[in-house]
């Protein structure tokens, strides 16, 4: 008897690498991991290095590291000096010329952290796409994560690209971000920008929806156990649901007169509201990068200038913004040597 055995198909290096990347292990790597893991490691490592050792004396004229006496809230990896423009500040570039200490002094770590951080976030979104495809589910998690990516890219990259240099981007630190928020308000009147309003509505609306949803599910859990702790009344692997959508619908119908009729619409709405808030915020920041104006109620400003007794919350905020600019410009940009004469400083009841 003759047995014919076929030859095993020859596997190329791509197939071998694909199998290794997608192997079932504790931490999934995948093709997205080639981008995510090194960039995330380098950006986090760069931030820890900068906040621990690197000064901002040469870029902002301030201390910004633990080594200089800062704490977690005041330490930061600060933006490059204004004179650097939009240079990528490569270690081997014409600015640092391979000198690591000089590179840190010029603000090279900020560009390093910002660019690697952006690619790390994109890699994390691609990771969610990849795992969703392998598991066989829809990629809505990745689509939702596009919101934080849009905000990061618009704030840390697009905004300074629209300004004169990386100097005007936020530095990577808690107090540094607060300073950037004050800067946006003083120079762009950001809180009166409609895209900021939509962003606030989306983020706070998403938090409200999350709280309501969690409370409603807890409220309508089946009473299928005698224990006071509801988590002891079910098995994590059971097939049947442990709460009543019908009861939840009835409850909210009595509260508001309307309620979500099915889970698909409910959860899509919970996805849509915060993600749209993040996207509209990102669009607004790109508008600020181009120095587009927010709402201007010029008639109120003219009347307030003519009538000392007329004042609105808008005109008070305009005066406050002028005060922010008059203080922040010389303090934040000492290299410009700004000097404001007394007659141009803001006056009025607001200050």
Curated annotation (Swiss-Prot):
Q: Where are the transmembrane segments?
A: 39-59, 123-139, 151-164, 206-226, 277-293
Any keyword DNA damage? Answer: no
Keyword set includes Transport: yes
Per the UniProt record, one Pfam family is Photo_RC
Q: Where in the cell is it found?
A: Cellular thylakoid membrane
Question: Principal place where this protein is found?
Answer: membrane
Residues binding a plastoquinone, per UniProt: 213, 260
Q: Which enzyme class?
A: oxidoreductase
Q: Name one GO biological process term.
A: photosynthetic electron transport in photosystem II
Keywords of the record? Chlorophyll, Chromophore, Electron transport, Iron, Magnesium, Membrane, Metal-binding, Oxidoreductase, Photosynthesis, Photosystem II, Thylakoid, Transmembrane, Transmembrane helix, Transport
Q: Quick one: which gene encodes this?
A: psbD1
The UniProt annotation places chlorophyll a PD2 binding at: 196
Catalysed reaction, written as an equation: 2 a plastoquinone + 4 hnu + 2 H2O = 2 a plastoquinol + O2
Which family does the entry's similarity section mention?
A: Belongs to the reaction center PufL/M/PsbA/D family.
Name it: Photosystem II D2 protein
Query: What does UniProt give as GO cellular component?
Result: photosystem II; plasma membrane-derived thylakoid membrane
EC numbers for this chain: 1.10.3.9
Please report the organism this UniProt entry assigns to the protein. Answer: Synechococcus sp. (strain CC9311)
Binding of pheophytin a, residues:
128, 141
Q: How does it assemble?
A: PSII is composed of 1 copy each of membrane proteins PsbA, PsbB, PsbC, PsbD, PsbE, PsbF, PsbH, PsbI, PsbJ, PsbK, PsbL, PsbM, PsbT, PsbX, PsbY, PsbZ, Psb30/Ycf12, peripheral proteins PsbO, CyanoQ (PsbQ), PsbU, PsbV and a large number of cofactors. It forms dimeric complexes.
Tell me which HAMAP family the record gives.
Answer: PSII_PsbD_D2
Q: What else is known?
A: 2 of the reaction center chlorophylls (ChlD1 and ChlD2) are entirely coordinated by water.
Q: How does it sit in the membrane?
A: Multi-pass membrane protein
Q: Which residues bind Fe cation?
A: 213, 267
């Amino acid at each position: 008897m003759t047995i014919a055995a076929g030859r095993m198909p020859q596997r190329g290096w791509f197939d071998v690498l694909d199998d290794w990347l997608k192997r079932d292990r504790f931490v999934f790597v995948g093709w997205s991991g080639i981008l995510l893991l090194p960039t995330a490691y380098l950006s986090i490592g760069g931030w820890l290095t900068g906040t621990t050792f690197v000064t901002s004396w040469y870029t902002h004229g301030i201390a910004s590291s633990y080594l200089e006496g800062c704490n977690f809230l005041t330490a930061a990896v600060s933006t490059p000096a204004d004179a650097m423009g939009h240079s990528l500040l490569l270690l081997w570039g014409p600015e640092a010329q391979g000198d690591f200490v000089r590179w840190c002094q010029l603000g090279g770590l900020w560009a390093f952290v910002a660019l690697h951080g952006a690619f790390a976030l994109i890699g994390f979104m691609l990771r969610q796409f990849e795992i969703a495809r392998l598991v066989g589910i829809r990629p809505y998690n990745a689509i939702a994560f596009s919101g934080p990516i849009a905000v990061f890219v618009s704030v840390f990259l697009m905004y300074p690209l629209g300004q004169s240099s990386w100097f005007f981007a936020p530095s990577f630190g808690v107090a540094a971000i607060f300073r950037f928020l004050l800067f946006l308000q003083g120079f762009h009147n950001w809180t009166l920008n409609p895209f900021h309003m939509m962003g606030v509505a989306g983020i706070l609306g998403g938090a409200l929806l999350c709280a309501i949803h969690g409370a409603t599910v807890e409220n309508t859990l089946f009473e299928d156990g005698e224990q006071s702790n509801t988590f002891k009344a079910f098995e994590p692997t059971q097939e049947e649901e442990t709460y009543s959508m019908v009861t939840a619908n009835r409850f909210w119908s009595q509260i508001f007169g309307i309620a979500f009729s099915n889970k698909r619409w409910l959860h899509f709405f919970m996805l849509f509201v915060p993600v749209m808030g993040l996207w509209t915020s990102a669009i607004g920041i790109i508008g600020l990068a181009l120095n587009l104006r927010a709402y201007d109620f010029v008639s109120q400003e003219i009347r307030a200038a003519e009538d000392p007794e007329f004042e609105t919350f808008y005109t008070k905020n305009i005066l406050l913004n002028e005060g922010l600019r008059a203080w922040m410009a010389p303090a934040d940009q000492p290299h410009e040597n700004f000097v404001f004469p007394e007659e141009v400083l803001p006056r009025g009841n607001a200050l």
